[in-house]
């Protein structure tokens, strides 16, 4: 009498289920984005919703904060984007576009999720008001500070030497 254990189809089904069990975790892992990939997707969304003429591209990504392992939990992000030469209507990736000389720089902050299936982000960007010093300004200011400090040191030396000179009593 033949039992189900001896059935070749049961062995095949067991093998199929085993393989599915091994493949499914890999499929889930493949849906988790890296921190930078999630930020790049958020920038794509910013470009789609922007009313500006040109695309924006990642200029600087702040270090990744310590995060929990749940890809569905919103993760805090902060980064800087800069205007490119590519028009917003182009189908070109912003990463393939050069930065526009004197292009608008925006500071962006918010949250992203790393779960590719959810693909959610909440980002707001404002014009970056930080001044980027030109080398000429840097050297001029450094020279002024050094000059002031040098004058202060010379004055302190003069004051010290005046106190060393013996005073004559009249």
UniProtKB/Swiss-Prot annotation:
* UniProt xrefs under PROSITE patterns: CATHELICIDINS_1, CATHELICIDINS_2
Protein keywords: Antibiotic, Antimicrobial, Cleavage on pair of basic residues, Disulfide bond, Immunity, Innate immunity, Secreted, Signal
Which SUPFAM superfamilies would you find in this protein's record?
Cystatin/monellin (SSF54403)
**Has keyword Aminoacyl-tRNA synthetase?**
no
Q: What is its main location?
A: secreted
Q: What are the GO MF terms of this UniProt record?
A: lipopolysaccharide binding
Q: Which InterPro entries match?
A: Cathelicidin-like, Cathelicidin_CS, Cathlecidin_C, Cystatin_sf
Family under the similarity heading: Belongs to the cathelicidin family.
Q: What is this protein for, i.e. what is its function?
A: Antimicrobial protein that is an integral component of the innate immune system. Binds to bacterial lipopolysaccharides (LPS). Acts via neutrophil N-formyl peptide receptors to enhance the release of CXCL2. Postsecretory processing generates multiple cathelicidin antimicrobial peptides with various lengths which act as a topical antimicrobial defense in sweat on skin. The unprocessed precursor form, cathelicidin antimicrobial peptide, inhibits the growth of Gram-negative E.coli and E.aerogenes with efficiencies comparable to that of the mature peptide LL-37 (in vitro).
Q: What is known of its domains?
A: The cathelin-like domain (CLD), which is the propeptide part, does not seem to exhibit auto-inhibitory function, as it does not inhibit the antibacterial activity of antibacterial peptide LL-37.
Please give the name of this protein.
Cathelicidin antimicrobial peptide
